[in-house]
Amino acid sequence: KLQDDLPPVPFEKIRASIEASFEQPLEALWSEFDPVPIGAASIAQVHRATTTDGRQVAVKVLRPGVRERFARDIDTYEWAAAHLESFGVEAARLRPRLVIANFKRWTNRELDLRREAASASELAEHMVGTEGYEIPGIDWDRTNGRVMTVDWIDGIKISNTEALKAAGHDTDEIASRLVLAFLKQAIAAGFFHADMHQGNLFVKADGTIAAIDFGIMGRIDRRARMWLAEILYGLTTGNYRRVAEIHFEAQYVPSYHNVDEFATALRAVGEPMRGKPVSELSVGQMLDGLFAITRDFDMQTQPHLLLLQKTMVMVEGIATQLNPKINMWDVSAPYVRSWIRDELGPEAAIADRIREDTQTLLRIPELVRRIEDRFPPKGGAPELPPLPDVEL
């Protein structure tokens, strides 16, 4: 994560790494390359450069040896997680081994800059038509597993509220737009930027939010997104019974528990939050309440939702800094309600049925072939007899 807080790798090593990965001199790709990085972190560092055709770009380069160091570190994490699970039921419920397995997968993706570039490209496609939110373009000719080149972004860090106001930006509007952009990614696209901390978001001169650093991405399938949207909408409207039912339908709560009791537990956490700006809420108390619910109702950790939960906290923190009076529920509810209507309405149901029927029809020829392979038609080759066991 590029938080400008680690000493950079000497430029000689960075140059050598770039030239080895492209098998050509650095000057063949960039006419100018600033040897002083604009950001350095544990995994990579970023340099400003100008391509040979005159474009301003940012070049992200993996730290030499970072892949080998991570491979050593993850062995320690896996050992610790396995021992933690052996301590008892409460530790096993948190599924630390599965959490570490997901962390390993996420980080291995982050260590391949081609994957990061592909993620940025995919997210840009999902966000087409979203006003005021931008993903920098990828320079594929100057990108490989160890180096990624993207369009240069000029802007103010989203965390610098004073500079944003001095430049004439409406920080309240930016806060709402950031929340809606995240909801579009997570709920509509099912593919979201999972590293939306303050160092990875900028505001351009025209007010556009520009995101960078796509090494960590989250993906949610359509069914989980439907559950998520209904849960969010249920919490915003106080329909705790429906939220509880969804948790049971998704099998997040073991079936031997009572739906109504779970709904009451949710109400105890949700009601104090409704109608209040984030500045008046205690996130710590809310998380304590939710964690108590997971414990009391034997809910296992859902690793596929950990990234989503982490990102939601990040987005809420930034939005609150931009607009201390923002009410996340009020901003989210209209979008979530509209998405649910579009996805659950009659037109969507008909489209889903047509899609499912088409997929079934397309599978029929393959099913027939497999049946004939298992049960040949008359005159076909007979099935081979089983071979006897012979002791040698």
Regions found by a protein language model. Give the residues of each.
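Histidine-centered phosphotransfer motif of kinases
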Residues: 193
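Broad phosphate/nucleotide-binding scaffolds in NTP-utilizing and phosphate-metabolizing enzymes
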Residues: 1-190, 198, 202-392
